[in-house]
Amino acid sequence: PTVHPVWLGGLLFAAYLTRPTTAVFIVLTFVYLLWRKRREAGLTAVTAVGLLLLFVIYTRTTMGLWLPPYYLPQRLAGSGAPVPIVLYGLLFSPGRGLFTFSPMFLLVLLLAAWKWRALRQEPFYGLALAWIGLHTATLLRFEHWWGGHSFGPRLLTDIVPAFMLLTIVFARQWPAGLRPSRQRWLMGLGVLSVMFSVYVNSYAGLYQVATAVWNITPDIDRAPQYLFNWRYPQFTATTATNCAKVTE
């Protein structure tokens, strides 16, 4: 079963209303619809654009602006840091790196690249990769690409569904031709990466107060260099390590 175009348009607008960075996904969704389901694209677009116009009218009436500041492109002014540094920070840094906090996503990406010849025929394969790449590229232009006071890669949570799509697509093409020993090794690596990711994003993120205090010892918005300091990864923060940061 497929989602009715009216519902889909409403959901896409709701996604944008919640997080304006989902505009990347919305554009890709319309490209997919025009490619695969052209008959549904029109009604989906009319619904989404209609709701967007109502939002614009409401904002103009109540705030005197076409869109709230949170939605304006001025946020894409850039941080002034070199692009490779920001990319490393987004993906591998000890303070905000997506693959540092959730290595299972790195494994999924590597497996998807490994089987690209078999997976490239899957429409969701290209959609997921484009979503991940374009969203990450958008964040490279953010002034505060690390997402302010938060835990881990907050601004990259939008692309978690893209990694889920890749996982599903890869699972359908599970490499049955591999020797059993290699299949066991691959599954073991997957289990370990999932366990580490769950630990970091549940126990460390939810129940360790020190990981929240890490943002203010010192203020990470004023001392973003600590995003890259492997002596003080956020997910291993303790009262002692936070105090050590302050006294450096």
Language model region names:
Residues R36-L111, Y125-L139, V160, F196-T211:
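Membrane-lumen/periplasm interface segments of specific transmembrane helices
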Residues L166-L189:
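Cytosolic-side transmembrane helix boundary signature
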Residues H4-R19, I26-L33, V49-L53, L90:
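Membrane-interface alpha helices of multi-pass inner-membrane proteins
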Residues H4, T44, L119-I132, R182-G190:
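Membrane-interfacial loop-to-transmembrane alpha-helix junctions, especially the N-terminal start
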Residues L139-F151:
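Interfacial helix-loop-helix junctions of multi-pass membrane proteins
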Residues V3, V24-V49, L109-R120, L165, ...:
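Perimembrane helix-loop-helix junctions
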Residues S150, M187-E248:
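Membrane-embedded, lumen/periplasm-facing catalytic core of multi-pass transferases
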